[in-house]
Amino acid sequence: MIRSTSLFSLLLRTHVTQQPVRVWLSLLGVSLGVMASVAITTANVDVLRSFEQAVTEVAGSATLEVLGGDLGVDETVIMAVRAAPGVTAVLPVIEEGIVMAQGGRHGEAVQLFGLDLIGEVGTRGFRLQPASGRDALEQLLASDTAYLGEKLAEDWHLNVGSQFEVIVGGRAVRLHVAGLLHTETARSSVWNRAMLMDIAAAQVLFESIGRLDRIEVVTAQDYPLEDIEAALRAALSPNLTIQRPAQRTKQVEQMVRAFQLNVSVLSWVGLLVGTFLIYNTIAFMVAQRRREIGIYRALGMTERRVAALFLTEAGILGIVGGIVGGITGVLLAGNLVSLVSQTISDLYVPISPGLAVMSFNHHLWSALLQGVSLGTIVSMIGAWGPSLDASRTIAVRALAPGDYEVTQQLRLPGFAWTAGGLFSLAAILSLLNPLAGLPVFGYLATLCLLAALSCLAPICIQALGFRPRRAQDFLLGPGGSLRQIAVSHAARHPGRNGVTVSALMIGLAIMIGVVVMVRSFRQTVELWVNETVIADMVVAPSAWLHGRNVGQASRALPGTWAAKLASIDGVAAVDTYRDVHVDVQGQSVALISRNLRLHAQRSRYLVIEGDSATMLRRAADTGGVLVSEVLANRLGVREGMSIAITTPAGVQSVPIVAKFYDYATDGGKMVMDRAQYQALWHDDRVTVFPIYLDVGADVAAVRRSIAQQVMMNEQGVASPLVISNAELRREILDIFDRTFVLTYVLEAIAVFIAVLGIMNTLVTAVLERRRELATLQAIGASPTQVRQLVLWEAAYLGALGAVLGVIGGLLLAVVLIKVINKQSFGWTIQMTVPIGVLLQAVILALGAALVAGYWPARWAANQPVVEGLREE
């Protein structure tokens, strides 16, 4: 047994050291595929974990919380909450975002918490280090002081006693550092990068006297939590939500799961392409050592041992590649965390950039385990077919003169029938409904499409050799006889060359499919922006571009500004646009209120049926709403039906007058008239003021007048953002483009792995054909002609991969747009085929193939003829 194991190890070492280039190419391919998958998984987990950690730390000992959505909670509710049975403590909380207005960190958003500092110090995982020389109680409660987390103070270069300026609710406010927050744990904490004030001081700062963001409730351990929840629901207004703090994390996970699943699936493409690379590597090993395998079989090595030999080699490649990919994946995840958190913040919910900071050591071991597992699985799957083929080698045929591989014929009709069956299955899967809101069958349909095209690859390669031609055709056309020899050689090995073409095809198809989807989506969004963003300019809070990273107080302006803005010369009309989230049939939905009659005159919504102006006036006259396509599908409603909206006065049933296309959020939105909104919610604030100018008005002059008017009439107000129509459109499209940066990174990795596959194929093909190439040189072929021969073969493989990649990419784009995107987010996208992108993809494939073939071609041309003919 020991001798057998030693012999086995010797054979493995010999095989690995004989062809180091091929081994390194395979290792690199596996490592890159594992790296992409580990990086995305780690970044996704870390971002959600940071949000969960923030919720848990801030909640402290609270077991329930009372929320009022974007409009907050009236502090008089505290008395009713405190009176509920089983409640032992009631903790008011204000949580808002503010923006730094000075220094190198100008424009950076940070979370500010307003808490009852007298009653809560030491209960939430932090302690205060106050400044000296000032009355402790006065310092604790002053409205112009704040406590900073240690990391935040370090980043902003502030010390105890320092003064700094921030933007709060459209006002410039000067605060001074009363002290630092010290956490009671060594790990990263939300308090390290947060700001803290007393609850009363925070209410003054945010001009929200009597309002809270939420009320946290501490309950008795011996009292059933469900009974306390029921008592609170009975005692409080129906527009208030009572939930456990952990539910916020679950809600965020529910919102982002489609986004994270789509990104994760895309990261697995590298693994899929890596599987083909391993298949090729092991298949070439088997082909090159076929005679050696025949000797092993003749000497008594069992089929199982032969298969185990090659599977072990693949397993070693997978383990080593998995280790390297796991380590580099964690390093890459450190850069992707900020990208993922920014995308989630843009589209869903604010994720503090300070919290989403990865610890390399924390993730290393789990990443290594994941990497080794993925690498081993990918390698074993890729090596399974070639290993079985090796184990079934017939010793007599392998030891006989001639090419064993040429005598093996592929069952092409079987490949054709399989491809047809997979295409049919893909079509059926595309028609099925999503599972739990996720396009599972859509992903399976894409897998079937790629598998079907992979089955066509060997058929297409062998078809090259059956093209009818006359003898003189060998001398005609580009490349002449060299081109025909290259085609003939490629056609002699449809199996393993088909694997190479499939790898390139998959990488290219994914790239084309995603690019066509993104371009179609962008063009649809551009059309939507051009049709709906009509206002000449928008007046917004200075922190508005930070989106939901800042709170409602920093994203709202006084409604009284409308009259002041309307009085400015050159201004024809001013709309009042308010954006809040409210409860609709148990779900959080974006509610837009504005002057619908003015909007009907000046702008439009892309209504699915009917005329925009008519529908807007009808909504204003009847007290109805317009709902977005996404929301209508999500709630299962349509025009003519009613929708239940929870308001401070109770649940209101509102008629739906129209559906419209909207691409601002994947959660959907509804639009109502501002007068109706104010009557129901008693909220006079405005998110932005869309401004319509007189014909011929000077945009620059009006912009200056707006800033002067606001600064002159409002004390301490920060200059608002005045954004022109062109700037607003550009900002919308910039946000769109940011969301797909991660997609492009993953595509590039998949295509690069496919290029490694071409290089691996050509390197091994050159090694296998040393005698053939040496014979050509011996009868007069020049080194240049040998190089051209290899490059022609590379070009044919690249061209075939490009053709199949374009076909697969277009089919994939249809599934992405019509099935996966529709089921994931609900948007209707008008598909457009960018011909320029397809041409670029073909050029990329050919260029990549030629680049990959250059080194093998050069190496083949420089090999000594004598060594190549030695066995002859």
Question: Can you describe what each PLM-predicted range is?
Answer:
Residues M1-E872:
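Alpha-helical transmembrane segments of bacterial inner-membrane membrane proteins
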